Amino acid sequence: YEKDLIKKHEYTRKDKEDDRTRHVTEQNANAEPVFLTYRAVPYIDHVVDTVRKDAPDYDIVTPDGIGHTVWTVRDEVMIGELVAFFNGVPALYIADGHHRTAAAIRYGQARRAATPNATGDEPFESFMAVVFPHNQLKIMDYNRVVKDLNGLSPEQFLAKVGEKFDI
């Protein structure tokens, strides 16, 4: 993130960053993963498909009806190859979690500043994330409701929005 290898596509609000940073600091943990994506790499897809042929380590459905299935990559050679291929991915993109990412970075920077002999390998130098290739995502609309036109007529409001966006 600090080296611009994790790309953001939306602005964050300082008050939300502050709140998330306080939460991470109080808990001394990032409790919710950031959702990242990358341009698919055929070899990574192949490894995932291979691992998924085995029985999962965890296969649960939460009370809200969402299924979670987890496999573990145990083969050391395969792990090394995955690390090498992921190191070759030019960028990751935040699909969900801009405020969590910003808070994790702020937390890490504060801990780094308070740790004079930091090596760069401390737990605060990373944050929890899930990563999916772009070809396995379905991007759905995320719409906002405008309740106050701030004194503008609907036509004026749409004209203002049209200055920045395609309508």
Regions of interest found by a model, annotated:
Residues 1-167:
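Surface-exposed, charge/polar-rich loops and edge strands
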